[in-house]
Curated annotation (Swiss-Prot):
Subunit and interaction comment: Heteromultimer composed of HisG and HisZ subunits.
Annotated keywords: Amino-acid biosynthesis, ATP-binding, Cytoplasm, Glycosyltransferase, Histidine biosynthesis, Nucleotide-binding, Transferase
Organism: Acidithiobacillus ferrooxidans (strain ATCC 23270 / DSM 14882 / CIP 104768 / NCIMB 8455)
Cell location: Cytoplasm
Pfam family, one: HisG
Pathway the protein takes part in: Amino-acid biosynthesis; L-histidine biosynthesis; L-histidine from 5-phospho-alpha-D-ribose 1-diphosphate: step 1/9
Protein name: ATP phosphoribosyltransferase
InterPro entries associated with the record: ATP_PRibTrfase_cat (IPR013820), ATP_PRibTrfase_CS (IPR018198), ATP_PRibTrfase_HisG (IPR001348), ATP_PRibTrfase_HisG_short (IPR024893)
Family: Belongs to the ATP phosphoribosyltransferase family. Short subfamily.
Domain notes: Lacks the C-terminal regulatory region which is replaced by HisZ.
Biological role: Catalyzes the condensation of ATP and 5-phosphoribose 1-diphosphate to form N'-(5'-phosphoribosyl)-ATP (PR-ATP). Has a crucial role in the pathway because the rate of histidine biosynthesis seems to be controlled primarily by regulation of HisG enzymatic activity.
GO cellular component terms given for this protein: cytoplasm
Amino acid sequence: MSTGITIALSKGRILQEAIPLFAGAGIHLAEDPEESRKLIIPSTDPTVRFLVIRASDVPTYVTWGAADVGIAGKDVLLEQEGLDLYEPLDLRIGICHMAVAEPAAMAADDAPQSWERVRIATKYPHITRHYFHSRGVQTEIIKLYGSMELAPLVGLADRIVDLVSSGRTLKENGLVEVEEIMPISSRLVVNRAAMKLKRRAIETLIRQLEAQVTP
């Protein structure tokens, strides 16, 4: 695979939305990653293979050259500091937004512009701290790895910062969105050394994927 391209991506929504993009570029996975237990999956193109890893690990694999190219959400890229990657293409998949949410009863009498200090549960402490610091709001951040909506319900935190798509999960747990932080989508990222050593192949891949991206 020294002259081929290794692409890192994660299971779930991003994978399902990325497969048609690759198919449109003439690259088909040889196996269904959702069904297979394999972590390295070949494609119908002998010069391309896929690594199926955790979403949060994609930037690390690409940064260190274990993968030449990867697909990662903008939330993951912003949360991890010090990444030395090219980010040539917004694939416009995995679209959602990052927001602050709180119990509906609290939101009825709340005014985000008046916040001076907040206690937030999130799996995005870096983004959260930076966002509130830019507004002059002091933060007490509790890092969680899942089920953010539970934190305000049991008194662990007053509010949460999380990704919101349909808003259904918030609603079912009695929470409402009170402030949007930023829009989120998945990006194509490229290892800097690979961009030099495999420029022709990677630039071809970028053009092929770009042609599949919905305007």
